[in-house]
């Protein structure tokens, strides 16, 4: 019997064995974790805060709800949700990368955000939570780094309660040619140089730019959510489609 050919996937523009990608992505985020928030502000000129604010508003969280902030990294969304759901609610900040979790935990504790937040190291493709557990799941700028996106979306559907809502905030495809050209120039020429200057790591930011280009476009991601079983799926483009917020429900 011949050996089975290993499954392959993309790591930026490179083709790698699927089982290698998680470790390679981990290396990127171990490298950038300490300066992640600074780089977000610098690279997006602070606009990422507006994108995240719109995500929070679209989530419709209420006191007492259970929220999963998946690939939550340094905890920007978790901090907002913690205030909204209150002491009777619960926010779980989950991330596959322990360096990002550590930065997020320290940041939120320094802000006095404790009590209704817990931290879980978890793989989005196989979430370690019971079925029908969360009212809301958000994943912001994390899905493009997942090896098997279909498995991750299915896993999110499983742990959502009936009536629950998934929101995916992710880089996408600009709608207009001029914006695409400007964005490509910025992503591949400017971002790596910023990474080299601020984090001494140009390679990680070159990967991040490539991972954005390899991520499914708006309509493709919408169909992936529908195929997984989500209903009433729609998306909102922001900043000409550089970023899109996809939303779907479990019924």
Swiss-Prot record:
Keywords: Menaquinone biosynthesis, Methyltransferase, S-adenosyl-L-methionine, Transferase, Ubiquinone biosynthesis. Transmembrane segments: none annotated. Belongs to the class I-like SAM-binding methyltransferase superfamily. MenG/UbiE family. Its EC number is 2.1.1.163, 2.1.1.201. Pathway: Quinol/quinone metabolism; menaquinone biosynthesis; menaquinol from 1,4-dihydroxy-2-naphthoate: step 2/2; Cofactor biosynthesis; ubiquinone biosynthesis. It comes from Shewanella piezotolerans (strain WP3 / JCM 13877). PROSITE patterns: SAM_MT_UBIE, UBIE_1, UBIE_2. Signal peptide: none annotated. This is Ubiquinone/menaquinone biosynthesis C-methyltransferase UbiE. S-adenosyl-L-methionine binds at residues 74, 95, 123-124. One of its GO terms (molecular function) is demethylmenaquinone methyltransferase activity. One of its GO terms (biological process) is aerobic respiration. HAMAP family: MenG_UbiE_methyltr (MF_01813).
